[in-house]
Amino acid sequence: MKNYYSSNPTFYLGIDCIIFGFNEGEISLLLLKRNFEPAMGEWSLMGGFVQKDESVDDAAKRVLAELTGLENVYMEQVGAFGAIDRDPGERVVSIAYYALININEYDRELVQKHNAYWVNINELPALIFDHPEMVDKAREMMKQKASVEPIGFNLLPKLFTLSQLQSLYEAISVSYTHLRAHET
């Protein structure tokens, strides 16, 4: 059995997190300004690699906690991204997850340490690799899910007004519509 595994190629299994927040009527995305290669100085999603002793879901929770200090956050798997040349460093297949967090509850020092910044979803800079595709798919999933389940509450503080709730759901709908309008 060992020969079967050793005769097949190996590659990395990555995790990329699309972290959404809501502030002042706008959906924002937590992005990393990379201070490491490949693509140093470029904008990316927060990511990491699955370790031998963890599931992909546990790896996503770990990556999110390492960046934000938050645990028990709403997360959903977006999908697998495995184009052969998606990462110029090595052969990497990535599983993307999106997370919805209250923008006022994360560890600001930890985020600064990772050189991460909140960016309005409708004003995103160019992202590396296939990260734009991940964001697009996550936005579509979030909009779809928000239309049938109350997932938006994860983006709001414990106490909120009805106008904040309305503003949130309008922002979820408008941000996705805005994206689609610019693609055509």
Residue ranges and their predicted role:
Residues 29, 34-36, 40, 47, ...:
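Short, His- and charge-rich active-site/binding loops that engage polyanionic ligands
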Residues 98-99, 107-146, 155-168, 180:
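NUDIX/MutT-family hydrolases
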